[in-house]
Amino acid sequence: MSDIMSTFSWLYGKPVATGKLKQLPEHFIVKEVLGYEFTGKGEHLMVKIRKTGENTKYVANEFAKFCGVKSKDISWAGLKDRHAVTEQWLSVHLPKSDHLNFVLFEVAHPGVEILEMTRHHKKLRPGDLLGNSFQLIATEVTDMDDVLARLEKVKVTGVPNYFGAQRFGHEGNNVTEARRWGRENVRTRDNTKRSFYLSAARSWIFNHIISQRITEGYFSLPVDGDILLDQNDRTVNENVTSEDCIQKIKKGELSISAALAGDNQLPTTEKALMFEQPQLDAEPDLMALIRGNRMRHERRSIELHPENLHWSVEGDQLTLNFSLTSGSFATVIVRELLQEIEVERTYD
């Protein structure tokens, strides 16, 4: 388990079990779920790939070279992990492709398979991703009984909707750099770095808000001044501590939200504000970066409920299957089940 995540509270207490995740790429399978169908015609070639041990940007750049286009002419709905087997779509602005033999691309890149091709009238964008389905295999698991007991709780209550360790970079470097940028008022034209550091800053503060609620025993219990979200992420103006709202939260019809910090005033009041404002105040450098880039405040649910969650056990091996909506992290589910033993990897 990444040390950076040990900063945040566990909903069910720190796990006693240990295990290995991603011992092989085949132990972490991700399949992308888009929110719409392609038209079958248009200037954009849509390519469904299965990649093993490769990251999305590398494959996209290699595919752009093969097609004879610039990197900016290729796009995707979501970035996928390198240490996994992942299926996803790429789009290439390529009005004509009859001259290309795509088998040659697969031969040159044995870690990539082309599964399907079609066409569409516009390119893929990050907001196009509806979610992902996962199959995760944890190996060398100890204390399997405790893991299974936790899984039963997860199925009912869910897990904290934390941003995962990958959001914060290797050893939390994105947060460290975000603080430096805020402190030194760094200005740059590198939009990629700016995006990484802003995301890390807001995610770090958000995670701390959830962690504080767990510590004080208010993870799934609304308090005065809370902002609730419906199933379409729209804010709900009701008496949030009423029995009706509490029952809707238990049924998953409403969810408690926490702040993705911005340069405008927090909308929470009373006790809910006391969970949020101190976390913003504790990170003046991160807030300087957020305000300096005129980020607007947003809300995000504090609960994550994996859909279609089921599992199987074979000896000391646990197989998990579930689906998540876009923007959620599979690793925060595993985090509530076991302490991850780091797997040594070699890099080409």
Swiss-Prot record:
EC number: 5.4.99.27
Gene Ontology MF terms in the entry: RNA binding; tRNA pseudouridine(13) synthase activity
GO biological process terms, semicolon-separated: tRNA pseudouridine synthesis
TRUD domain span: 158-304
Catalytic activity reported: uridine(13) in tRNA = pseudouridine(13) in tRNA
PROSITE patterns attached to this UniProt entry: TRUD, UPF0024
Domain of life: Bacteria
Uppermost EC category: isomerase
Protein keywords: Isomerase, tRNA processing
InterPro entries according to UniProt: PsdUridine_synth_cat_dom_sf (IPR020103), PsdUridine_synth_TruD (IPR001656), PsdUridine_synth_TruD_CS (IPR020119), PsdUridine_synth_TruD_insert (IPR011760), TruD_catalytic (IPR042214), TruD_insert_sf (IPR043165), TruD_pseudoU_synthase (IPR050170)
Record: active site: 81
Cystine residue pairs: none
Cellular component GO terms, alphabetical: cytosol
Manganese as UniProt keyword: no
NCBIfam families according to UniProt: PRK00984.1-4, tRNA_TruD_broad
Family, as annotated: Belongs to the pseudouridine synthase TruD family.
Function, in words: Responsible for synthesis of pseudouridine from uracil-13 in transfer RNAs.
HAMAP family: TruD
PANTHER family registered for this protein in UniProt: TRNA PSEUDOURIDINE SYNTHASE D (PTHR47811:SF1)
Name of the protein: tRNA pseudouridine synthase D
Record gene name: truD
